[in-house]
């Protein structure tokens, strides 16, 4: 059987560029080379698409770009992708190793944040007609927007904390009104987040009016819409979901942050900023099963595919479960929760990558299958 050709795409122009590089390096190092030929495509912070065939370890530390730039013949311009980006839809499939054209069989996007997991690049793959790992346009777009995710979770009947949504102009032009609305509905402390930013980028905990105003302005710099959530005194519990139409949930894990909350550094930098415990201790069987049920329901109601990680709070005093958010392209670094949860559930890293690629082909075939309506 001939090998499938997988394009692993990383980088991008989002604030999570560095996270993407580290995740991509891990995927490349662990993918089954007996089953797949790998093409590596990096997107610089300026938006330039470059084919890369240098040392894998140079991806995580950022040195890959200088190496790729020295080989213009190996750049994607041959395939219709210029230094400014995509020039033709078909160019996405025709990535060229050396001077020989060979189409990509499947794309594994290891992209986080805006333009990577928000449905933008997924739409490009759809137009090009290429199977790809992960959620489609709808699930990616809604899953990236925390405010709209909450609206859909509410319709689904999933328990969550109270929240308010504002836009950037309100924060910049009518900050007093914004603060008054928040203080009239929520109590301190509360959390302020950009609606469309992942990995806790731009997220801050506000303990008083002064810190609230500061947090609102930080969030407004990261996105045009701002989400303000009530503080829940809860344990941070996470659950991984895998599949397409019949997804399954992993065991659950707990993040024990040493900081005030599980921020960007805690998620992606090795050190003492947080501790991950799998399985999460001191949770009743009923609570664990309810979390797993909610995770699958969240996955389905957003029309997700392939993979997602769903984050919850379990109240430290009452034991109540609150869904927090969903991540449709969770990190794949050495300390990332998603692969760790599946490893603890019996699916090792390399096998997980293989399953995700198989799910990509399955979804591709399903979305293009013609159904005959037998009803007159």
Swiss-Prot record:
This protein's GO CC annotations = cytosol
A Pfam family the protein falls into: Dala_Dala_lig_C
Known EC number: 6.3.2.4
Binding-site positions, Mg(2+) 2: 325, 327
Leader sequence residues: none
State the Gene Ontology BP annotations.
cell wall organization; peptidoglycan biosynthetic process; regulation of cell shape
Major localization listed first in the record, in broad terms? cytoplasm
Molecular function terms, GO-annotated = ATP binding; D-alanine-D-alanine ligase activity; metal ion binding
For binding ATP, which residues are annotated in this chain's numbering? 183-238
Q: What pathway does this protein act in?
A: Cell wall biogenesis; peptidoglycan biosynthesis
* Protein's UniProt name: D-alanine--D-alanine ligase
Name the source organism: Ruminiclostridium cellulolyticum (strain ATCC 35319 / DSM 5812 / JCM 6584 / H10) (Clostridium cellulolyticum)
Q: Which gene encodes it?
A: ddl
């Amino acid at each position: 059987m001939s090998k499938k050709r997988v394009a692993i795409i990383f980088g991008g122009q989002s604030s999570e560029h560095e996270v993407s590089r580290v995740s991509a390096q891990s995927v490349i190092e662990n993918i089954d080379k007996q089953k797949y030929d790998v093409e590596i495509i990096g997107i610089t912070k300026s938006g330039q698409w470059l084919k890369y065939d240098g040392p894998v370890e140079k991806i995580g530390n950022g040195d890959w770009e200088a190496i790729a730039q020295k080989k213009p013949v190996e750049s994607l311009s041959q395939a219709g992708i210029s230094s400014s980006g995509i020039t033709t839809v078909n160019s996405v499939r025709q990535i060229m190793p050396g001077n020989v054209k060979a189409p990509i069989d499947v794309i594994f996007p290891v992209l986080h944040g805006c333009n990577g997991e928000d449905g933008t690049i997924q739409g490009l793959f759809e137009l090009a007609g290429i199977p790809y790992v992960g959620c489609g346009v709808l699930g990616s777009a809604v899953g990236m927007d925390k405010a709209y995710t909450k609206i859909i979770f509410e319709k689904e009947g999933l328990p969550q904390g109270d929240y308010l949504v504002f836009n950037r102009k309100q924060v910049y032009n009518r900050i007093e009104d914004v603060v008054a609305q928040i203080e009239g509905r929520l109590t301190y402390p509360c959390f302020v987040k950009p609606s469309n930013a992942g990995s806790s980028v731009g997220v801050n905990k506000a303990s008083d009016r002064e810190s609230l105003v500061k947090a609102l302005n930080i969030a407004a710099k990261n996105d045009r819409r701002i989400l303000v959530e009530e503080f829940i005194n809860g344990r941070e519990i996470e659950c991984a979901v895998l599949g397409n139409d019949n997804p399954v949930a992993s065991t659950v894990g707990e993040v024990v942050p040493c900081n005030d909350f599980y921020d960007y550094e805690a998620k992606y930098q090795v050190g003492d900023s947080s501790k991950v415990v799998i399985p999460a201790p001191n949770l009743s069987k009923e609570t664990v099963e309810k979390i797993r049920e909610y995770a699958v329901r969240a996955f389905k109601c957003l029309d997700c595919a392939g993979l997602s990680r769903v984050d919850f709070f379990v109240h430290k005093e009452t034991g109540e479960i609150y869904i927090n958010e969903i991540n449709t392209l969770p990190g794949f670094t050495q300390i990332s929760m998603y692969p760790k949860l599946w490893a603890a559930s019996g699916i090792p890293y390399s096998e997980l990558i293989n399953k995700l690629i198989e799910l990509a082909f399955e979804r591709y075939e399903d979305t293009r299958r013609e159904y005959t309506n037998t009803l007159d």
